[in-house]
């Protein structure tokens, strides 16, 4: 089953998405997501200039061989651009293989391990009162796992905050220059336990409570934070410190039993090997779009299962609905599943990407349509051209550049 065409589309129906479409000689198509927030054109170029020409004439069934060819054959292995491109190819080929088999992808992977995929939502507020209102709204929607972020008194900007009340959170700023935000660790450490206390006092412990620290703390600060919030029984604290120094997580582990989730910026099993092997984390947050597609994520999840580490894949709406569809199939199958991030998509985005998944009372299901169960409206996508946008950068109050 030869590949005859491989096309790359960059569209911005509210956010920039990079979509790969592979077509076989039989007319069967597969979709893959290659979106890399703020660096979309780099991945699109890598695909268009290097991978797509080398896909033509290959057997679409040989997914593993193609994965290895693009990973080892590039010589310059790993990295977010290379791996996002490989991920899109892999995703599209699995879409094709499942369509040929006339079954949804999760069945091809080995069948469902659960009835539905528990997803967690994002709640925010510029004050504790606003955050509690947003929490209540998502609780009414049926979410069983809820991430909560909140504005911090004395800080003009805080990670996870929308530009205005009632608006969806959008971190990237359109234009040619990233927004600069200020950060104060001490103000954060002093305030955030008050938010969790307010949530638990008002809503109790029925929902799983999550929080994203977004790489902002040093290891000892993260240990202090984790210890200070143990009474609130967090589902996890996410990205407490930059993970390049993986040994530092041992220090955090020594001081707190608050579960740790890490990995949204990882793009291969080698990025998380030590963290998993030494059981320094509880959830691995690698995503299909950045960590090698279905093929790459299977390796990571299988390895993690040996050490009782569960998946908690990154999945905000700066990854396209194609990734979300693929992730739900993967999540329904993978034995050591934990939770799936789900921000939701605008109506405009979903018109470009007609989908087959469903949400019911805190759980999602990918549907039983053959393949990924998602489509791509090329004509509509063409009406939304690429718009430059960049993720923010953070500075301490004295002007020092910090981790965003």
UniProtKB/Swiss-Prot annotation:
CDD domains: RspA. It holds the Pfam family MR_MLE_C. Binds 1 Mg(2+) ion per subunit. It is an enzyme of class 4 (lyase). It comes from the Bacteria. Keywords: Lyase, Magnesium, Metal-binding. One of its GO terms (biological process) is carbohydrate catabolic process. InterPro entries: D-mannonate_dehydratase-like, D-mannonate_dehydratase_GalD, DgoD-like, Enolase-like_C_sf, Enolase-like_N, Enolase_C-like, Mandel_Rmase/mucon_lact_enz_CS, Mandelate_racemase_C. Its cofactor is Mg(2+). It catalyses: D-mannonate = 2-dehydro-3-deoxy-D-gluconate + H2O. The record marks 316 as: Important for activity and substrate specificity. Its EC number is 4.2.1.-, 4.2.1.8. One of its GO terms (molecular function) is mannonate dehydratase activity. Mg(2+) binds at residues 212, 238, 264. Substrate binds at residues 37, 122, 264, 285, 314, 318, 341. The active site is at residues 159, 214. Belongs to the mandelate racemase/muconate lactonizing enzyme family. GalD subfamily. Has low D-mannonate dehydratase activity (in vitro), suggesting that this is not a physiological substrate and that it has no significant role in D-mannonate degradation in vivo. Has no detectable activity with a panel of 70 other acid sugars (in vitro). This is D-galactonate dehydratase family member RspA. It comes from Escherichia albertii (strain TW07627).
């Amino acid at each position: 089953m030869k590949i005859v065409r491989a096309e790359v589309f960059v569209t911005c129906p509210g956010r920039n998405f990079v979509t790969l479409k592979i077509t076989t000689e039989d007319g069967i198509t597969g979709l893959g997501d290659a979106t890399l927030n703020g660096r979309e054109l780099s991945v699109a170029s890598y695909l268009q200039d290097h991978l797509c020409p080398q896909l033509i004439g290959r057997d679409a069934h040989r997914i593993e061989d193609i994965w290895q060819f693009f990973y080892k054959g590039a010589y310059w292995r790993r990295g977010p651009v290379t791996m996002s491109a490989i991920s899109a190819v892999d995703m599209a080929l699995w879409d094709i293989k499942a369509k040929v088999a006339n079954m949804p992808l999760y069945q091809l992977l080995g069948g469902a391990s659960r009835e539905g995929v528990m997803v967690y939502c994002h709640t925010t507020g510029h004050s504790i009162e606003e955050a509690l209102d947003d929490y209540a709204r998502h609780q009414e929607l049926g979410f069983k796992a809820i991430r909560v972020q909140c504005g911090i008194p004395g800080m003009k900007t805080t990670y996870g905050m929308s530009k205005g009340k009632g608006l969806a959170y959008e971190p990237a700023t359109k234009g040619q220059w990233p927004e600069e935000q200020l950060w104060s660790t001490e103000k954060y450490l002093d305030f955030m336990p008050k938010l969790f206390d307010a949530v638990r006092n008002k809503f109790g412990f029925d929902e799983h409570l999550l929080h994203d620290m977004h790489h902002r703390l040093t290891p000892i600060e993260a240990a202090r934070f984790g210890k200070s919030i143990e009474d609130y029984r967090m589902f996890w604290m996410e990205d407490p410190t930059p993970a390049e120094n993986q040994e530092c997580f041992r220090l955090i582990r020594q001081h707190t039993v608050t579960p740790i989730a890490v990995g949204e910026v990882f793009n291969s099993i080698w990025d998380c090997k030590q963290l998993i092997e030494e059981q320094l984390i509880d959830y691995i947050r690698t995503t299909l779009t950045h960590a090698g597609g279905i093929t790459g994520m299977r390796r990571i999840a299988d390895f993690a299962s040996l050490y009782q580490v569960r998946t908690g894949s990154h999945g905000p709406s700066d990854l396209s609905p194609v990734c979300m569809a693929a992730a739900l199939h993967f999540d329904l199958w993978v034995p050591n599943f934990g939770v799936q991030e789900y921000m939701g998509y605008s109506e405009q985005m979903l018109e470009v990407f007609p989908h087959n998944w469903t949400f019911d009372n805190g759980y999602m299901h990918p549907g039983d349509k053959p393949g990924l169960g998602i489509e791509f409206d090329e004509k509509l996508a063409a009406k939304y051209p690429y718009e430059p946008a960049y993720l923010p950068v953070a500075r301490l109050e004295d002007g020092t550049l910090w981790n965003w």
